[in-house]
Amino acid sequence: MRKSLFSLFVSMALLVSFSTPSWAKVVDLDSLQAQLSQNEVVRGDFKQSRHLEMFNQPLTSTGIFTLSKSHGLLWQQQIPFAVNLVLTQDKLRQTFANQAPKTITAQENPMAFYFSHVFLSVFHGDTAALKEQFTLDFSAQDSGQWQLVLTPKQAPLNAVFKTITLSGNTHIDQLMLEELRGDKTEIEFTQQASLPKELTDAEKAQFDF
């Protein structure tokens, strides 16, 4: 469970950090960083494909997500089965179908939340913190498409991942996590929108612990 949670931490934090308004055109790393955290809320669909060395076919899941700068991440897997995950700065609640929810805190599992906090430093515009953890390789095309490859430089990240690659245009469209042991996770994000600008009452209720 810890590794799957880590993948979600990475996805959440990088999405929050690099979501940009629809009019923005990212041409270099500076312009990418300059547009951090422009939207209070980002919603969309996701498709996650987990490629494992032991299986010929990827394990695929789909659902919807809601990201809030002030509240955290609401990650709602719908297929192949329902999973509701709520992540805040210091708490995580996971609910499978009609089972009772399970909650962990940063105090109970500091290592898991360490990963989230590392990437959330980008959310605050702390590019120095990102460069402490990764070697950054950025490229952009005239069309506005861009790619950022993160190569971990130190433990514990470099003990798990070979590279983390983000690509997109005005938003992150794809996130790929390549592990040292050969496994790979690809997450595609579509239908991203930032309206309404605030969480609905139903969305806010999800973040009540």
Task: List each model region and its residues.
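Positively charged n-region of N-terminal signal peptides that target proteins for export
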Residues: 1-4
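Bacterial N-terminal signal peptides
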Residues: 7-17
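Sec/Tat signal peptide C-region and signal peptidase I cleavage site
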Residues: 18-24
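Polybasic/polar functional segments that serve as interface/processing modules
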Residues: 24-52, 58-66, 93, 99-101, ...
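Short hydrophobic/aromatic-rich beta-strand segments that constitute the beta-sheet cores
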Residues: 46, 73-77, 92-95, 148-150, ...
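An acidic-aromatic
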Residues: 64-113, 185
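Gly/Pro-enriched, hydrophobic low-complexity segments
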Residues: 127-209
